[in-house]
């Protein structure tokens, strides 16, 4: 792949059981191959891919001296797995474990200094896997999105009936078991509905326009996966991450701020809360000023934690 500002970005693959995972490995400028570096596995948002905001953070943290790995989730992007577009929390968590596996095989990585970083839903997955992934020595999220809230409450949609959705999921599973094509719904609308909440407009602008649109980011999901997402609670065991440190980074204007607060309040010390004034959920994806502040905090956090 291309290089930028002395950053070497290389496409790599690594296994998750029988699934081939696709990633981009970023290494620091002027890397000394005789040395070992701290490393980060970077998980992407729901509907996203490694070339978007996860790759942005991976590249910027490599510029700060880290070996970083941004990777596509199983069933998504350039990673393998069928059916395509599945969003399975258990598999997303296993993807992260396998990314750590891969990092431990690299001669340039100090295996005792590996951290996890997740953006949006990726933030919830790194927090969820960390209690039982002891190789992760420090964990951070940026603009965390709790998909359980969306699946159970329909947030940010104003009208939603969970029971009706579950009945529909059951009917769809029965139909698919009898041979019907797998149903996929838009995770990001192809057109912004009239009167849509601002965060939906932000999502559309990021994923569906030249701002960050990528041909491997389909921004759809398997409809029946909503049942799995309803069962997923990212902070169920979050207090067990301690004494390893965790960090939540969120914009003061992010509609999702309450999702990070729920995890932060349940987590044990050492934990940190870092707000970026004026930033919305998606400004922390690619806005240079907002991302710059987030990266500066991440550099400080991982610098003393790994």
Predicted features and spans:
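Alpha/beta-hydrolase active-site loop
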Residues: 53, 86-107
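Conserved alpha/beta-hydrolase
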Residues: 60-80
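Alpha/beta-hydrolase fold nucleophile elbow
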Residues: 108-120
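Alpha/beta-hydrolase-fold enzymes
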Residues: 127-209
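Short beta-strand/loop motif that positions the catalytic acidic residue
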Residues: 241-242, 248-250
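Catalytic histidine-centered segment of alpha/beta-hydrolase-like enzymes
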Residues: 279-292
């Amino acid at each position: 792949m291309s290089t930028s500002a002395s950053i070497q970005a290389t496409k790599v693959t690594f296994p998750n059981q029988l699934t081939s995972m696709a990633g981009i490995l970023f290494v620091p400028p002027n890397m000394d191959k005789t040395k070992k570096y701290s490393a980060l596995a970077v998980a992407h948002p729901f509907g996203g891919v490694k070339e978007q905001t996860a790759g942005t953070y991976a590249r910027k943290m490599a510029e700060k001296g880290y070996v970083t790995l941004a990777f596509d989730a199983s069933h998504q992007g350039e990673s393998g797995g069928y059916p395509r577009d599945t969003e399975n929390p258990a598999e997303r968590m296993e993807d992260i474990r396998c990314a750590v596996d891969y990092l431990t095989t690299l001669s340039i990585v100090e295996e005792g200094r590996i951290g996890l970083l997740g953006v949006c839903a990726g933030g919830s997955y790194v927090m969820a896997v960390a209690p039982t992934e002891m190789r992760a020595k420090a964990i951070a999220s940026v603009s965390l999105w709790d998909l359980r809230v969306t699946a159970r409450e329909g947030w940010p949609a104003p009208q939603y009936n969970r029971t009706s959705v579950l009945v529909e999921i059951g009917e769809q599973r029965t139909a698919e078991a009898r041979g019907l094509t797998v149903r996929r719904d838009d995770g990001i609308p192809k057109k912004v509905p009239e009167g849509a909440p601002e965060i939906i407009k932000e999502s559309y602008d990021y994923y569906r326009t030249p701002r960050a649109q990528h041909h491997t980011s389909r921004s759809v999901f398997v409809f029946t996966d909503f049942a799995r997402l309803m069962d997923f609670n990212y902070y169920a065991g979050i207090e067990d991450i301690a004494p390893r440190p965790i960090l939540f980074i969120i914009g003061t204007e992010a509609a999702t701020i309450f999702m990070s607060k729920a995890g932060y309040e349940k987590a044990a010390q050492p934990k940190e809360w870092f707000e970026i004034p004026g930033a919305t959920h998606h400004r922390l994806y690619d806005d240079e000023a907002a991302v710059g502040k987030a990266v500066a905090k991440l550099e400080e956090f991982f610098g003393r934690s790994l």
